[in-house]
Curated annotation (Swiss-Prot):
It comes from Desulforudis audaxviator (strain MP104C). Tetrapolymerization of the monopyrrole PBG into the hydroxymethylbilane pre-uroporphyrinogen in several discrete steps. This is Porphobilinogen deaminase. Its EC number is 2.5.1.61. Belongs to the HMBS family. Keywords: Porphyrin biosynthesis, Transferase. One of its GO terms (cellular component) is cytoplasm. Gene3D superfamilies: Periplasmic binding protein-like II (3.40.190.10), Porphobilinogen deaminase, C-terminal domain (3.30.160.40). One of its GO terms (biological process) is protoporphyrinogen IX biosynthetic process. It catalyses: 4 porphobilinogen + H2O = hydroxymethylbilane + 4 NH4(+). Monomer.
Length: 309
C-alpha cells in the first residue's frame, strides 16, 4: 500500500470542496495513507470572458487534469461528472462515481420572485445552452444572457444587478453551504439536468490497481448505472457538454428510468421522451432512448445548433 496519494482538482472553492469530500471518505477507509491535494488550472478556468459554447467542449475543465494523470503527476482526478466528456483518453477510466446529490437546477432571484413571477423582459443569467433552451420554452418572454465564472462570481453579478435572476445546479450550492440563496428548485419536468449533474466522477489510470481498489470503496453503484445510461445517450446523440441536451436516470420499482430532452437554442423546438430498462443494462437503455429521440427529430435540431454555434 502506497503511503501517499496525490489528488488532482481544479482550484475553485467548489472544486476544492468536492476534492475534500473524496479525500475525507478515502481517509476514513485508509487512515495510514497521506492524501495530498494538488490544484491544476484548466482551459475553462483561464477563459472566462467567452461563452462556453463558443470555446468548444472537448475537456474544457478536465483535459489538464487528465494530462497530469497520464504523466503520473497525480494519482486520481476529481471532476464534476457533468464536465467529464463521454470519451476518455486511452489509459484512463472512471474509477468511482459518487453518490448523487439532488441533480436538478435551482432558481435564484434578487427580489425573491419565482421563475413564473418574473416580469416580461427580465434578465436571466446562465452559462448553459441546455438551461437556456428549456427555460425559454417555458418563458420565451425572458432575456437570457451568459454568465461565466465560479458560483460566488455569478452570485455577485446577481447582487450587483447585472441579472435579475440566476439558474444554477443545486449540488454546487449545497456543497458550498449556500443553499439559503435558493428561491426555489426548478422541477425536472420543466428543466432536465445536464448528464451526470449532481455526481462526482473520480478518474484514474486503468493500470493502477491499487488506486482503483481504493476508489471502489466510494463508488455508488446506483448512481454509476444512472450516469452510465445518461452518458451513453449523450454519446449516441454525438452531443457534448455544450449542447442543449438534458437527461436524468432514476430508479423506480427496481428498474432504471431514463428521461431526456433535446431542444433548439430558442426553445421553440423540443423533443422529450423516456424509457425504462433493467438496472444492469444502462448502456442499452441509453442507446435505445437516443435512437428514439433521433427518430423524433433530435438529430436535425442538434445539427442546426452546431451550424449556428
Amino acid at each position: 500500500m502506497r503511503r501517499e496519494v496525490v489528488v488532482g482538482t481544479r482550484g475553485s472553492r467548489l472544486a476544492l470542496a468536492q476534492a475534500d469530500w473524496v479525500i475525507d471518505h478515502l481517509r476514513a477507509r485508509y487512515p495510514r495513507v497521506s492524501f495530498v491535494r494538488k490544484e491544476i488550472r484548466t482551459t475553462g478556468d483561464n477563459i472566462l470572458e467567452v461563452a462556453l459554447a463558443k470555446i468548444g467542449d472537448k475537456g474544457l475543465f478536465t483535459k489538464e487534469l487528465e494530462q497530469a494523470l497520464l504523466h503520473r503527476e497525480i494519482d486520481l482526478a476529481v471532476h464534476s461528472m457533468k464536465d467529464l466528456p463521454t470519451g476518455l483518453p486511452e489509459g484512463l477510466v472512471i474509477g468511482a462515481v459518487s453518490v448523487r446529490e439532488y441533480p436538478g437546477d435551482v432558481f435564484i432571484s434578487r427580489g425573491g420572485e419565482r421563475l413564473e413571477e418574473l416580469p416580461a423582459g427580465a434578465v436571466l443569467g446562465t452559462s448553459s445552452l441546455r438551461r437556456t433552451a428549456q427555460l425559454l420554452a417555458y418563458r420565451p418572454d425572458l432575456q437570457v444572457i451568459p454568465v461565466r465564472g465560479n458560483v460566488q462570481t455569478r452570485l455577485r453579478k446577481l447582487d450587483e444587478g447585472v441579472v435579475d435572476a440566476l439558474v444554477l445546479a443545486w449540488a454546487g450550492l449545497f456543497r458550498l453551504g449556500l443553499t439559503e440563496r435558493v428561491t426555489h428548485r426548478i422541477p425536472v419536468a420543466m428543466c432536465l439536468p445536464a448528464v451526470g449533474q449532481g455526481a462526482l466522477g473520480i478518474e484514474a489510470r486503468a493500470d493502477d490497481a491499487e488506486i482503483l481498489e481504493m476508489l471502489r470503496t466510494i463508488d455508488h453503484a446506483p448512481t454509476r448505472a444512472a450516469v452510465q445510461a445518461e452518458r451513453t445517450l449523450l454519446r449516441r446523440l454525438e452531443g457534448g457538454c455544450q449542447v442543449p441536451v438534458g437527461a436524468l436516470g432514476r430508479f423506480r420499482d427496481g428498474r432504471l428510468v431514463l428521461e431526456a430532452v433535446v431542444a433548439s437554442l430558442d426553445g421553440t423546438e423540443l423533443v422529450r421522451a423516456q424509457e425504462s430498462g433493467p438496472a444492469d443494462r444502462p448502456e442499452a437503455l441509453g442507446n435505445s432512448l437516443a435512437v428514439r429521440l433521433l427518430e423524433m427529430g433530435a438529430g436535425e435540431i442538434l445539427a442546426r445548433v452546431r451550424a449556428g454555434a
